[in-house]
Amino acid sequence: MPSFDIVSEITMHEVRNAVENANRVLSTRYDFRGVEAVIELNEKNESVKLTTESDFQLEQLIEILIGSCVKRGIEHNSLDIPSEAEHHGKLYSKEVKLKQGIETEMAKKITKLIKDSKIKVQTQIQGEQVRVTGKSRDDLQAAIQLVKGAELGQPFQFNNFRD
């Protein structure tokens, strides 16, 4: 029976490249001359720390990071940006988390979405991925289009397509 897996993964190498590009853009920006501004990648925690001197500049750093990520093929909704900035002395900072894997709640939403659509496929939650199995490739492709079209707040990849 044909099947495929729905996953949510980010290539850390691409994130590293995006952070390096963002730092390069940061060094050439006129409005950041003489300002203490840093974009750091923490691969162990899967997060990016943004630090600068003002709240407005912090928002500019977020825009630079998002732009660099989009250029590297990382969707902007795979970044979990906190609404409140941390204030330490004269510096403002935000810890942007990278969304990896599908949480159980999101997997249940995907399963419910597919079952409610009456497409003749079966879904199984397997850890941080969802396996979709069906009798025909057309049903599987319809399920892919359904999940792509739904605004679930997280980017998904479809891999391991078996016939």
From Swiss-Prot:
InterPro entries: DUF520, UPF0234-like_C, UPF0234_N, YajQ-like_sf. Pfam families: DUF520. One of its GO terms (molecular function) is nucleotide binding. GO terms for cellular component: cytosol. Keywords: Nucleotide-binding. Transmembrane segments: none annotated. Nucleotide-binding protein. Belongs to the YajQ family. HAMAP family: YajQ. This is Nucleotide-binding protein APL_1231. The lineage of its organism: Bacteria, Pseudomonadati, Pseudomonadota, Gammaproteobacteria, Pasteurellales.
